[in-house]
């Protein structure tokens, strides 16, 4: 059977084996799920979470470097050049580690998720290809000019190189999140029963997908916050030690100002993401809120509680009236559907999906499109959007058309993701976000009053706050990706269908290998970062440009 499956993959018919052939494939889905599916998900989660330790800092530091160097070019003050070089060194260390950990991410689609790659490769691969050709090469080309062009380029020329690095970093995030946003809201595409694949029908719709755009601005804003808190904390450490005081004060001022603006934007853009999720991923919102029953509008927000998924209730729940209704619907009259109602809707979708599945079998059996009765085509067209729900039954039965009512109910219940981890991951993320607004706001006020070094206890808080934006970012990733389960493509392709036919021992071995390698890389990153921070900024002997008469005091 392994040889047969391999030949089907080579012939480009992997999905046909899953959608058409009764017998073996269904059996393997049921038997493999606990090992291959879970292990493949675990491997992707581990590598993604490791990679995302480096991405936010790269996004944010690239912009902060552009700001600092712009001030240097405009004022000619040597300390701003020194700041740009120092923080640029830390950016370079992080950038290299981000590239090293990111390469594996794309290979996994072919290694562990070959069915997924075959099914949607034409759509998902396009943004990733553009990212590599446009954004990554832009970033990789100009990052060399940033580090080695200080004495070879003019001020403005080097500044343009720095801007190009920042643009490349953010363009990379844009294209990757366009691909991810399509997985969350698969617009501009349709299933072709002749090729058994998803195909692009409107690339502009994929590009302008509102979910993708909201994810992009929310994610890059989170990266700006991460870099701001990093610069804030390191600068606070310098002030506590009495080292590089002038550089630290200016860096802290930039970080507090930029961080406050970014923190506020994260909240606003996160609200937009929540609103769009309630439109396109209602189950995710219901699970985040542990909303078991549909509440009368406007729904309340559960601040605290212990969700019990088995009993479908939340113990010791503390609610704030109206808040969730305003966030999720932006109205006082529109209800937010609860988990139980959504499960019932999923059961109806599964039954409609079975109708589409049956029509697809007839279309494929006819061989020639012209030989397919029009009424069969119409039935498939009317119900094809639900065919992914029929594939949820592959866990329990070889042929979804043979599913019992109990199996359909069980598959409908599978559409509920893990409520407890989602509930708390979201609240940890939000709690940290509001704390960082308070922290950056406090230092913004202290900076305006020129009292940055007056309160050592606040500086210590800033130092200890350095890990917080990373924790919030990882929690956000969990909310976005774990909340999409059981779908690898929302409503289209279940996660259990997307995996490759690998042995569990093979996947487990690669997990252990990746964990070992990534842990070593993380330790190297931390060691290099700490060494560079302890060494401090290098003295810059280049004469400072004279842009104003000596009688005019330059701005701090």
What is the predicted function of each stretch?
Residues 31-49, 76-83, 107-129, 181-217, ...:
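Membrane-interface interhelical loops and short amphipathic "cap" helices
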Residues 45, 210-223, 311-432, 511:
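Individual transmembrane alpha-helix segments
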Residues 75-93, 119-125, 129, 149-167, ...:
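Membrane-interfacial loop-to-helix junctions in multi-pass inner-membrane proteins
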Residues 92-101, 163-186, 259-270, 463-480:
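Hydrophobic alpha-helical membrane-insertion segments
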Residues 94-164, 181, 482-485:
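Membrane-interface helix-loop-helix modules in multi-pass inner-membrane proteins
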Residues 143-153, 157-163, 174-183, 207-284, ...:
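Internal alpha-helical transmembrane segments
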Residues 175, 179, 259-365:
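Aromatic-rich transmembrane-lumenal/periplasmic boundary elements in polytopic membrane proteins
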Residues 414-477, 505-533:
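C-terminal substrate/ligand-recognition segments
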């Amino acid at each position: 059977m392994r040889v047969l499956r391999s030949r089907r993959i080579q012939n480009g018919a992997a999905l046909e084996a899953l959608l058409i052939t009764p017998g073996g494939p269904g059996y393997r889905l049921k038997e493999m799920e606990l090992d291959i599916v879970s292990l493949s998900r675990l491997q992707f989660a581990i590598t993604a979470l490791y990679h995302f330790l480096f991405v936010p800092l790269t996004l944010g530091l690239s912009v902060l470097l552009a700001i600092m160097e712009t001030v240097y070019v405009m004022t000619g003050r040597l300390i701003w050049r020194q700041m740009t070089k120092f923080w640029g060194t830390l950016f370079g260390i992080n950038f290299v580690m981000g590239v090293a950990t990111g390469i594996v991410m794309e290979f996994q689609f072919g290694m562990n998720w070959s069915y997924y790659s075959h099914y949607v490769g034409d759509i998902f691969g396009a943004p990733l290809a553009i990212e590599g050709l446009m954004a990554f090469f832009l970033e990789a080309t100009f990052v060399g000019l940033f580090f080695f062009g200080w004495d070879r380029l003019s001020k403005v020329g080097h500044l343009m190189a720095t801007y190009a690095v920042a643009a490349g970093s953010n363009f990379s995030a844009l294209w990757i999140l366009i691909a991810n946003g399509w997985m969350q809201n698969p617009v501009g595409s349709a299933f072709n029963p002749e090729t058994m694949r998803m195909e692009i029908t409107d690339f502009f719709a994929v590009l302008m997908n509102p979910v993708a755009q909201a994810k992009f601005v929310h994610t890059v804003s989170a990266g700006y916050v991460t870099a701001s808190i990093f610069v804030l904390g390191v600068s606070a450490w310098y002030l506590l030690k009495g080292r590089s005081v002038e550089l630290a004060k200016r860096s802290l001022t930039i970080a507090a100002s930029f961080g406050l603006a970014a923190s506020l934007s994260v909240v606003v853009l996160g609200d937009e993401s929540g609103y769009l999720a309630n439109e396109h991923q209602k189950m995710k919102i219901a699970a985040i809120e542990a909303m078991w029953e549909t509440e009368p509008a406007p729904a309340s927000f559960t601040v605290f509680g212990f969700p019990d998924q088995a009993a479908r209730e939340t113990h010791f729940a503390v609610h704030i009236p109206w808040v969730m209704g305003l966030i999720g619907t932006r109205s006082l009259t529109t209800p937010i559907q609860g988990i139980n109602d959504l499960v019932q809707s999923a059961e109806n979708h599964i039954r409609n999906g079975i109708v589409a599945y049956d029509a697809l079998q007839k279309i494929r059996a006819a061989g020639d499109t012209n030989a397919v009765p029009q009424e069969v085509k119409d039935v498939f067209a009317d119900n094809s959007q639900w065919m992914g729900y029929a594939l949820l039954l592959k866990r329990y039965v070889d042929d979804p058309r043979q599913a019992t009512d109990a199996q359909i109910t069980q598959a409908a219940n599978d559409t509920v993701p893990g409520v407890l981890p989602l509930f708390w991951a979201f609240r940890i993320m939000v709690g940290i976000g509001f704390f960082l607004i308070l922290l950056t706001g406090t230092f913004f006020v202290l900076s305006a009053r020129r009292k940055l070094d007056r309160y050592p206890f606040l500086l210590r808080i800033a130092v200890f706050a350095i890990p917080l934006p990373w924790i919030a970012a990882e929690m956000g990733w969990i909310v976005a990706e774990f909340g999409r389960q059981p779908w690898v493509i929302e409503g289209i392709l279940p996660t259990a269908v997307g995996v490759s036919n690998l042995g569990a021992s093979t996947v487990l071995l690669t997990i252990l290998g990746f964990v070992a390698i990534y842990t070593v890389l993380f330790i190297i990153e931390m060691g290099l970062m700490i060494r560079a921070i302890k060494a401090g900024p290098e003295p810059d002997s280049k004469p400072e440009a004279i842009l104003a008469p000596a009688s005019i005091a330059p701005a701090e």
